[in-house]
């Protein structure tokens, strides 16, 4: 009897849910239609706003070209791409209106332009309008201690919405890797959209790190020790990679900065027909006046590291390798060696990392041989590179490595990480001659530094010449040609 009652209750429950199916379907359909109507209405309003903004004083419509670069005043390699891209477009489309969306609200537009000239020696030939965004904190990694990728990506949508509400461009280019803004500007703003990808937000390498339960700057130790948490994170990464691929595929033009980035973007976005490699512009010409022969202004050798103070740059590895080099006395007495870190700090988190690096050098007893130069002018950077014997780079799977190219152009012998762009595109043989060195572990770096310093001056000069000859393909001029060719589709 009880079994019969349970069966009757189950049938009744199924009939109840079945009766709700069609009404639920109608409600969902109605809500979807309403959402489409609202979004379409917003799009129409934005189109009217666009026409008002793009009309000049003489009544003619002007094309509005906007770059989304929330950290345009940071002074890194990504910012050099931004300013060179703007300069190239202004040469070809001088009548257009140029806009940069930025979150650098603590400075004004003139100060940003002066900073670009001071750091990169770039001065634009036409005016640029800056749209200052107040919600940049939504894309700060410090706001999301967990689910950082998802948090920053969702935050970029709100930041993109703020940008779109202030200015609706004809052409939108994301030059900083915020792919989740692409569908917003394409389908709501009605813009032609392009993207320059420095580094995929997620990559198959990141999936491998979690799958193999390896510790990394983006994979905490407590997760690697727990198989269940590792599986949960792996599922989260796969879902995020799928969504990242969907939003990235909205781009009408995709530019990537290296072979390594190309392989990952083709795998994730699957838009090979509109994806091209556009090597980032490196100010090769500026460094060519540095003599290749070794200067002996001061005794000993100078080692330099050029790059922003971000966790993925792995600066601690350089200090540990340097300490190992000194402690094992692989080279001459310590006073003859000095390691100088040169880079930009974007925010308080970067400043905190610099302080942590200072403490690490103190803990290892090498603080008197290590210096930090923060946000220094371009001329000062050039002076350091002119005196350096070795340039250090330790980022695993660096997307490209503008700092690596600058070191090679300046005549510094580069010692880079054996992965990513440096391995595939930069530190490669030129006409059969080596152009630099690659390493991975702390021991590798220490031994290779010792090997370079033990070479004769003539051998080092030969490597310098080959390296300098090889980097002409990364010049500003080459960038302008390939960039303009790639974005041409956006202006048709």
From Swiss-Prot:
Residues exposed to the Cytoplasmic side: 41-233, 255-399, 421-492
InterPro entries: ALG11 (IPR038013), ALG11_N (IPR031814), Glyco_trans_1 (IPR001296)
Intramembrane segments: 234-254, 400-420
Pathway as given in its UniProt record: Protein modification; protein glycosylation
EC code(s) of this entry: 2.4.1.131
Keywords for the protein's UniProt record, in alphabetical order: Endoplasmic reticulum, Glycosyltransferase, Membrane, Transferase, Transmembrane, Transmembrane helix
Domain of life: Eukaryota
Regions that span the bilayer: 20-40
GO terms for cellular component: endoplasmic reticulum membrane
Top-rank EC class of the record's enzyme: transferase
UniProt keyword Transferase, yes or no: yes
An example molecular function term from Gene Ontology annotations: GDP-Man:Man3GlcNAc2-PP-Dol alpha-1,2-mannosyltransferase activity
Entry annotated with the keyword Chloroplast: no
Catalytic activity: an alpha-D-Man-(1->3)-[alpha-D-Man-(1->6)]-beta-D-Man-(1->4)-beta-D-GlcNAc-(1->4)-alpha-D-GlcNAc-diphospho-di-trans,poly-cis-dolichol + 2 GDP-alpha-D-mannose = an alpha-D-Man-(1->2)-alpha-D-Man-(1->2)-alpha-D-Man-(1->3)-[alpha-D-Man-(1->6)]-beta-D-Man-(1->4)-beta-D-GlcNAc-(1->4)-alpha-D-GlcNAc-diphospho-di-trans,poly-cis-dolichol + 2 GDP + 2 H(+)
Membrane topology type: Single-pass membrane protein
PANTHER family membership: GDP-MAN:MAN(3)GLCNAC(2)-PP-DOL ALPHA-1,2-MANNOSYLTRANSFERASE
Name of this chain's protein: GDP-Man:Man(3)GlcNAc(2)-PP-Dol alpha-1,2-mannosyltransferase
Gene source species: Pongo abelii
């Amino acid at each position: 009897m009880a079994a019969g009652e349970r069966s009757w209750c189950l049938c009744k429950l199924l009939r109840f849910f079945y009766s709700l199916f069609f009404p639920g379907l109608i409600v969902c359909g109605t809500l979807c239609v309403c959402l489409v109507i609202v979004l379409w209405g917003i799009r129409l309003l934005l189109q009217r706003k666009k026409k008002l903004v793009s009309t000049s004083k003489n009544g003619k419509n002007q094309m509005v070209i906007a770059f989304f670069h929330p950290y345009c005043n940071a002074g890194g390699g990504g910012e050099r791409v931004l300013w060179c891209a703007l300069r190239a477009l202004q040469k070809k489309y001088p009548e257009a209106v140029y806009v940069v969306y930025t979150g650098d609200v603590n400075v004004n537009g003139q100060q940003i332009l002066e900073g670009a000239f001071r750091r990169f020696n770039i001065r634009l030939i036409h005016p640029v309008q800056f749209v200052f965004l107040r919600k940049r904190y939504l894309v700060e990694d410090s706001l999301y201690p967990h689910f950082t990728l998802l948090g920053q990506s969702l935050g970029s949508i709100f930041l993109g919405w703020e940008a779109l509400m202030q200015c609706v461009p004809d052409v939108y280019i994301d030059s900083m890797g915020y792919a989740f803004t692409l569908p917003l500007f394409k389908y709501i703003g009605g813009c032609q959209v392009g993207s320059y990808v420095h580094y995929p937000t997620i990559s198959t390498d990141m999936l491998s790190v979690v799958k193999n339960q390896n510790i990394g700057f983006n994979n905490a130790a407590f997760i690697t020790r727990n198989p269940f948490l590792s599986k949960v994170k792996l599922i989260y990464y796969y879902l995020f990679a799928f969504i990242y691929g969907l939003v990235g595929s909205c781009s009408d033009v995709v530019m990537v900065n290296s072979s390594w980035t190309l392989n990952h973007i083709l795998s994730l976005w699957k838009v090979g027909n509109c994806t091209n490699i556009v090597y980032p512009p490196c100010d090769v010409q500026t460094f060519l006046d540095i003599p290749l022969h070794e200067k002996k202004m001061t005794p000993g050798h100078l080692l330099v590291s050029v790059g922003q103070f971000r966790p993925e740059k792995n600066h601690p590895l350089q200090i540990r390798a340097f300490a190992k080099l000194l402690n094992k006395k692989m080279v001459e007495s310590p006073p003859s060696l000095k390691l100088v870190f040169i880079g930009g700090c974007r925010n308080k988190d970067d400043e905190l990392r610099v302080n942590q690096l200072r403490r690490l050098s103190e803990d290892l007893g090498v603080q008197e041989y290590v210096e930090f130069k923060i946000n220094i002018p371009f001329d000062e950077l050039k002076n350091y590179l002119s005196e350096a014997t070795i340039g250090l780079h330790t980022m695993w799977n660096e997307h490209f490595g503008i700092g690596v190219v600058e070191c090679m152009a300046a005549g510094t012998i580069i010692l880079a990480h054996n992965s990513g762009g440096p391995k595939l595109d930069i530190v490669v043989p030129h006409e059969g001659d080596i152009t630099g060195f690659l390493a991975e572990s702390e021991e590798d770096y220490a031994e290779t530094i010792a090997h370079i310093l033990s070479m004769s001056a003539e051998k080092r000069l030969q490597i310098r010449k080959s390296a300098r000859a090889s980097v002409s393909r990364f010049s500003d001029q080459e960038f302008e040609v390939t960039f303009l060719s790639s974005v041409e589709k956006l202006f048709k």
